[in-house]
Amino acid sequence: MQLGRKVTSHHDIDRFGVASTADESVYRPLPPRLRLAQVNLSRRRCRTQSDMYKSRFSECTVQSVDVSVTELRAHLSDWLDRARAGGEVVITERGIPIARLAALDSTDTLERLTAEGVIGKATAQRPVAAGRPRPRPQRPVSDRVSDQRR
């Protein structure tokens, strides 16, 4: 899509449902029937949605995105990249939110629980069962399985 060109058909729409206007730095959202996704950008890092698209979500701060199930299926890897970069994707079906896709912060959770004293780091090796020998089966397991199948 060329910047500054008048939107005349659905072919002028980029994959985020945004069409350009005469001014290159201003983007105008399309009517709801043509809109594939609604993007809320933080104005600190990305000025336009095309900046966000070109950077593949790594340089832009994205607050949240509403995306239809159809668009999610068509470009799943791009939406996963967005979630991995820290963005939040709200999945909608016929305009109704049904799910939220966000990155997992498992390392932060572990650090927080360790700092609160809820969990601690392992200090020793796991104890090995000692004192009793392993029980030996009286007959093979395959015989028992075949008995159960009869």
Swiss-Prot record:
Coiled coil, from the record: none
Molecular function terms, GO-annotated: toxin sequestering activity
Residue span of region Disordered: 124-150
Induction per the UniProt record: Induced in persister cells in response to D-cycloserine.
GO cellular component, one term: plasma membrane
Gene3D superfamilies: YefM-like domain (3.40.1620.10)
Family: Belongs to the phD/YefM antitoxin family.
Entries under PANTHER family matching the protein: ANTITOXIN VAPB46 (PTHR35377:SF5), ANTITOXIN VAPB49-RELATED-RELATED (PTHR35377)
NCBIfam families xref list: phd_fam
Chain's role: Possibly the antitoxin component of a type II toxin-antitoxin (TA) system. Its cognate toxin is VapC49 (Potential).
Name of the protein: Putative antitoxin VapB49
Annotated organism of origin: Mycobacterium tuberculosis (strain ATCC 25618 / H37Rv)
Lineage, opening ranks: Bacteria, Bacillati, Actinomycetota, Actinomycetes, Mycobacteriales
